[in-house]
């Protein structure tokens, strides 16, 4: 009897000890999982894109890189009006095309003369990136920048020297305009352009030329809270179309070291990969008008409230975010 009682007590003690150990040990999560930064980013749901630059004044979508900088001359530019409108529309932040493919810079960069510093706007003292950054702070919007890797203006594009120039441009944007919530890298790379007067077509090794690992290191070091957008992330990814929708099933995971700028199987990006080992959720970019830059002929073609509601359900409702472009 005593032996039976002693055995029962030992068994009970062992059970209690094992249970305590299970409760105190941390259960390993199923990998991959999002970072806290990615979770905060996805909770934004909707934010704005603004395409603005030389193309706006030359009625173009993709500038060739040789438009006269003097044509950039806005008379009534009011970034605070932009910010107020975006807040009223329910946007949580805005990303500005600091430099599009034509190479024109909306801030007074010291890396090139092809910038706002040499325009009539404010007698060369303007800085649209800075003005919008301040407006965002005033009205409670998050602020981000788009910096095209492809530059159809620069004679050095395609060479190692251009990479140094591009990194300097990136560091200027990351260092001088407060906290950024997203940094956007376009996947359109290489092709015909002015290239300092060469007027030719240039191709690059899309996987390796830009040295994106180094670029991402620069962003993480100077803007640790910024989500990095690229075709394959790493922070968030392109959804594989510019129509504003994700697949009905849209996994937040992709295979690591597979997706790169110009990725051939880009249509798969709208679905993601169920067995992907890298957490990189989708972002749905779409314009409120047919074009990304402003064109007067499209004034009657603005998306309706019904259109936008449908896009919201097909982007945010499909496990992505909605990046809505406003051409100004």
Model regions and ranges:
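Bacterial Sec-dependent N-terminal signal peptides
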Residues: 1-22
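Mature catalytic domains of secreted/periplasmic carbohydrate-active enzymes
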Residues: 21-328
């Amino acid at each position: 009897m005593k032996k039976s009682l002693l055995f029962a007590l030992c068994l009970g003690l062992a059970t209690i000890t094992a249970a305590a150990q299970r409760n105190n040990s941390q259960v390993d999560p199923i990998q991959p999982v999002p970072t806290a930064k990615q979770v905060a980013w996805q909770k934004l749901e909707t934010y704005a894109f603004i395409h603005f630059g030389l193309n706006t004044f030359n009625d173009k979508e993709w500038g060739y890189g040789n438009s006269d900088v003097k044509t950039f001359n806005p008379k009534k530019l009011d970034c605070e009006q932009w910010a107020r409108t975006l807040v009223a529309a329910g946007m949580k932040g805005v990303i500005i095309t600091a430099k599009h493919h034509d190479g024109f810079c909306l801030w007074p960069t010291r890396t090139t003369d092809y910038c706002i510093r040499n325009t009539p706007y404010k007698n060369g003292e303007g800085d649209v990136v800075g003005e919008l950054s301040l407006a965002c702070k005033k009205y409670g919007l998050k602020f981000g920048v788009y910096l095209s890797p492809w530059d159809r203006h620069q004679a050095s594009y395609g060479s190692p020297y251009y990479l140094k120039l591009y990194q300097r441009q990136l560091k200027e944007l990351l260092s001088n305009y407060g906290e950024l919530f997203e940094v956007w890298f376009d996947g359109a790379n290489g092709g015909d352009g002015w290239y300092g007067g060469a007027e030719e077509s240039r191709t690059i090794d899309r996987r390796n030329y830009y040295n994106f690992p180094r670029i991402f290191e620069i962003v993480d070091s100077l803007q640790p809270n910024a989500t990095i957008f690229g075709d394959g992330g790493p922070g968030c990814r392109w959804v594989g179309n510019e129509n504003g929708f994700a697949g009905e099933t849209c996994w937040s995971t992709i295979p690591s070291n597979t997706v790169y700028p110009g990725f051939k199987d880009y249509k798969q990006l709208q679905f993601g990969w169920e067995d992907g080992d890298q957490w990189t959720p989708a972002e749905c970019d779409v314009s409120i008008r047919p074009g990304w830059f402003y064109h007067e002929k499209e004034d009657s073609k603005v998306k309706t409230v019904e259109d936008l509601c449908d896009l919201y359900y097909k982007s945010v409702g499909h496990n992505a975010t909605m990046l809505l472009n406003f051409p100004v």
